[in-house]
A protein has these predicted regions:
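C-terminal signal-anchor/stop-transfer transmembrane helix together with its immediate cytosolic
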Residues: 1-22, 227-267
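Residue-level signature of catalytic and energy-coupling elements of molecular machines
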Residues: 7, 91, 116, 159, ...
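Membrane-embedded segments
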Residues: 13-128, 143
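Juxtamembrane amphipathic/hinge helix adjacent to a transmembrane helix
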Residues: 29, 208-240
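Solvent-exposed loop/turn segments at secondary-structure junctions
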Residues: 38-39, 76-80, 102, 136-139, ...
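Soluble extramembrane regions of membrane proteins in the secretory/endomembrane system
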Residues: 83, 94, 111, 115-119, ...
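Short, hinge-like loop/turn segments at secondary-structure boundaries
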Residues: 87-90, 177-180, 223-226
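VWA/integrin I-like adhesion module and closely mimicked acidic/polar interface patches used
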Residues: 104, 129, 136-200
Length: 267
């Protein structure tokens, strides 16, 4: 009868709740600093530089669920679109709202980088990273890009820089009385400065000339930035039938032994 009772318990699949499990995973703090000047509407990347950059960055965010990630945008000015967070649903929703024209036009690379540094400098993470993406030359702001890089270095922040735009000229849309027209504009990216920012902070400079190369760049950064951290994961349900199964096996074994020894001689 005891074996039958235990079998009933097993079939009921008992579970425990409120359990914690320790695991090891990768996690760092990352701030994305993205140029949203009007030149990011150029269509050498599809559908344009900004949307291509948003798509690839969003995929990068989805691939790093345990990271604190924030978003800083810049043109002639800079502001924080989203502070560091592990709530990537909120981050991605705020990312969708990023468009040229929400701040004064221009390219303040130094200001954008300095803002990103201010958002990550107090982080206690083992690895602090900024991914700065721009398609132009610093022409606004009171902080020089190299000065901002020195500040980043002081706080132990590594900066990866990405220059986005094809070689030569790129088609740029503009509105006329006859609708949208396109004009080929020169692609001017201050690569020496972007390389210097990366070198100063221990990062790396990349050039993205199309969608595929931009995607590959983020993939490369993803591979380079892996830091093991300890994470406690909360599990609501945990199967507990194994101990009961062991008990059932033990009872059956005892019953078999009794049947072949003591109970064998009972008429």
């Amino acid at each position: 009868m005891a074996a039958v009772a235990v079998l009933i318990v097993i079939l009921a699949r008992p579970q425990s709740t409120n359990s914690w499990q320790n695991s090891s995973t990768e996690g760092i703090d990352i701030v994305l600093a993205m140029d949203i000047s009007t030149s990011m509407m150029a269509q050498d990347l599809k559908p344009n530089r900004l949307e291509a950059s948003k798509d690839v960055a969003s995929a990068f965010i989805n691939g790093r669920p345990n990271d604190n990630i924030g978003l800083v945008v810049f043109a002639a000015e800079s502001f924080t679109q989203c502070p560091l967070t592990t709530d990537h649903t909120v981050l991605l929703n705020l990312f969708k709202d990023v468009q040229p024209g929400i701040i004064q036009d221009g390219t303040a690379i130094g200001l954008g980088l300095a803002n990103a540094v201010s958002r990550i400098k107090d982080s206690q993470a083992k690895s602090k990273v900024i991914i700065l993406l721009t398609d132009g030359v610093n022409n606004q702001g009171e902080i020089a890009p190299v000065t901002a890089a020195e500040i980043a270095k002081t706080f132990g922040v590594r900066v990866y820089t990405i220059g986005v735009g094809t070689q030569g000229k790129a088609p740029y849309p503009f509105q006329t009385a006859f609708g949208v027209q396109y004009m080929d504009v020169d692609v001017e990216i201050d690569e020496p400065t972007l390389k210097q920012i990366a070198a100063t902070t221990g990062g790396q400079y990349f050039r993205a000339t199309d969608n595929a190369s931009l995607k590959e760049i983020y993939s490369e950064i993803d591979k380079m930035e892996k830091t093991k951290i300890s994470v406690q994961e909360y599990s609501k349900k945990q199967e507990e039938y194994k101990n009961w199964a062991i008990l059932l096996f033990s009872l059956l074994l005892v019953e078999i032994l009794l049947r072949n020894t003591l109970l064998r001689n009972i008429p």
